[in-house]
Amino acid sequence: MSGNKISTLQALVFFLYRFFILRRWCHRSPKQKYQKCPSHGLHQYQDLSNHTLIFNVEGALLKSNSLFPYFMVVAFEAGGVIRSLFLLVLYPFISLMSYEMGLKTMVMLSFFGVKKESFRVGKSVLPKYFLEDVGLEMFQVLKRGGKRVAVSDLPQVMIDVFLRDYLEIEVVVGRDMKMVGGYYLGIVEDKKNLEIAFDKVVQEERLGSGRRLIGITSFNSPSHRSLFSQFCQEIYFVRNSDKKSWQTLPQDQYPKPLIFHDGRLAVKPTPLNTLVLFMWAPFAAVLAAARLVFGLNLPYSLANPFLAFSGIHLTLTVNNHNDLISADRKRGCLFVCNHRTLLDPLYISYALRKKNMKAVTYSLSRLSELLAPIKTVRLTRDRVKDGQAMEKLLSQGDLVVCPEGTTCREPYLLRFSPLFSEVCDVIVPVAIDSHVTFFYGTTASGLKAFDPIFFLLNPFPSYTVKLLDPVSGSSSSTCRGVPDNGKVNFEVANHVQHEIGNALGFECTNLTRRDKYLILAGNNGVVKKK
């Protein structure tokens, strides 16, 4: 009997020993082959040129933890108003889902049915929003690395141009999208494919350069943490508290300056901003219609006060131009301005209270041409014909010309065409700047007929018009008889460009209309005649 008790006791002890001791020993974590460090430890490295930095875009580069604004940009710009409203309505439910499920849902809502060939949001619109969300401290660390590898859960088409072209990241590993017949299905490839692509990149890096691999990710990214731990000797983790203390990357420190960008949205579409935008839309439609009707039909003495009352701010700065503006002249004045929106000539007319002004344009929609209260004439891009047309218009009154040939939203001036310097003795440079809150009044790939309407949809748009000191044209008596008159034309055009740039604090460039449209729309910007 006592022997049975002893055997039973031994069995119980052996069971407990196996269950608690051996089980714990067998399932304990293996010794880690990497070091876990806080992200601020990276700043202690004096030289990272012999290291390959592998970082998670959402967790370690961008300040914001929310991906909603980027998918809202895709939904609004590529899918339209209804799709973006649908995404906003479903966002409360998406926020309750897991990270992976919420991401897949937003991809489905934003990309389903979008044609691949016409999708240019990732190249022309999204880089602006991503750049405005980059943390300065982390960017400075990445800039010191010998090679940078970006890993992201976002679709490759959303992040590739932003990382490669604007941040000069050598390798970008994102998730591919499934397609049928050239249309996106709104379904991203499984994470296993992302891991396979990442594994291939890392193996090539190991065999090719032999650099030490350092991983940078977030505490909130367990999938990337396990992925990095397989290959990296060191892993640095970014906390949310670290991100809150980061500064935003300034524009003057962009590796490649952001000169051109497209899209209608001028505000970052966070959930709150998007909700405010849709709540404002009904009032904006009524306000824009009132501004359009009364602004075009009332005399300037009544139109200007009404537009100011409706929220449009117009500022005019004039330096002793009364002799040019008010005096009777045989020929009109040539006002040469930089190009911000299609409304530039109209606001010069409003500012000077002169309704008999005329404007020449390189491209203008039929609707805008019909609605314009001042006469507009299209240029043919034939130098002789355009010069004759401008001289004829000057004989009839004042003329406004935008020699850039297209608009630019950022503080840069495109190259000025020298044609204007040949048609008038006295040129009045005009520096123009405009600001909006919700919508841009320009587009490269959208419908240009809606440009003025989108500008008027803003609650408080503003225009600043500065008349600068007059400049002598190449047709003046001082320039006649010069052997190389073509060189004088370019010198006058460059001088006017620099005067306007200095007045606005803008940087002068040699970029042209063709450069802009090749980047934003994939064409050379020439409007086909119908």
UniProtKB/Swiss-Prot annotation:
Arranged from A to Z, the UniProt key words for this protein are: Acyltransferase, Lipid biosynthesis, Lipid metabolism, Membrane, Phospholipid biosynthesis, Phospholipid metabolism, Transferase, Transmembrane, Transmembrane helix
Report the main location listed first in the record.
Answer: membrane
**Membrane-crossing residues?**
70-90, 93-113, 275-295
**Membrane topology of this protein:** Multi-pass membrane protein
Q: What is its EC number?
A: 2.3.1.15
Known SMART domains for this protein? PlsC
Q: Where on the tree of life does the source sit, at the highest rank? A: Eukaryota
Q: Tissue range of expression?
A: Weakly or not expressed in roots, leaves, seedlings, developing siliques and flower buds.
An example Gene Ontology biological process: CDP-diacylglycerol biosynthetic process
Which pathway, metabolic or otherwise, does it act in? Phospholipid metabolism; CDP-diacylglycerol biosynthesis; CDP-diacylglycerol from sn-glycerol 3-phosphate: step 1/3
InterPro entries assigned: HAD_RAM2/GPAT1-8, Plipid/glycerol_acylTrfase
Is the keyword Translocase in the record?
no
Motif (HXXXXD motif) spans which residues?
339-344
Class in the EC hierarchy, top level:
transferase
The domain comment in this protein's record states: The HXXXXD motif is essential for acyltransferase activity and may constitute the binding site for the phosphate moiety of the glycerol-3-phosphate.
The function of this protein is: Esterifies acyl-group from acyl-ACP to the sn-1 position of glycerol-3-phosphate, an essential step in glycerolipid biosynthesis.
By what name is this protein known?
A: Probable glycerol-3-phosphate acyltransferase 2
Q: Which organism is it from?
A: Arabidopsis thaliana (Mouse-ear cress)
Q: What is the lineage of its organism?
A: Eukaryota, Viridiplantae, Streptophyta, Embryophyta, Tracheophyta
